[in-house]
């Protein structure tokens, strides 16, 4: 964490400069401190094609003289040097006591926008600026910036289909399992096949108590994958995809396979 001067603060201070000064009865020159920060509650952002989502960035900060009402700015730094910020949506800080405030800024993400490409998928780092009520009287000590406050995981949505046949099947005979993995293409606005990905064929006997991994599969052309495996008991079969730094993890719907004795 470090204190920053007005000259490096960014768009936030340009707006604050036009606002009337907040009263600072106790001229304590201690810079503000960022206590915690989160983006989307720490959850992974999973986005499909042509999807619009508004998410919240939260920063909790304190200063001896309090945090000014509009004293927060949040940016995300991501893959390929990309920067994500939302200057058009309001950011505010609400006090919870005389020194501490909860600051929020809203980010509107539209994967149908030409500004969003598939390269935006990945891990982003959260940066924040906070300003105390000393901003107008002692700007040199009223601002703090901090980077790497949180990791924001942005993933392209994934889908898995799955089919198993024959069903019912004689005990000991092979079941043919076929699936397809598709992922959101934010640039074309559709789901497309994802070749070269790893998926797990899993099984749980009836009644389901323990999931059994059966086989590791790899997707080929158009995201298709398949295998055969002997059926020994009634139960449900499905595919599980663990995801990557670009694609979200997902499961296929389960298929119950009835196994006939003899």
Locations of regions flagged by a protein language model:
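Secretory targeting and sorting signals
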Residues: 1-25
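Beta-strand-rich domain onsets/edges
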Residues: 31-49, 146-191, 256-261
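Extracellular acidic, Ser/Thr/Pro-rich low-complexity tracts
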Residues: 51-69, 75-81, 132, 183
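Short flexible loop/turn segments that cap and initiate beta-strands
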Residues: 66-79, 185-213
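Glycine-centered loop-to-beta-strand initiation motif
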Residues: 99-105, 210-229, 235
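Signal that preferentially marks extracellular ectodomain short beta-strand elements
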Residues: 102-121, 227
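Enriched for extracellular/lumenal, surface-exposed ectodomains of secreted and cell-surface proteins
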Residues: 118-140, 233-253
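Short Trp-Ser/Thr-centered turn/loop motifs at beta-strand boundaries
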Residues: 142-155, 219, 226-229, 246-257, ...
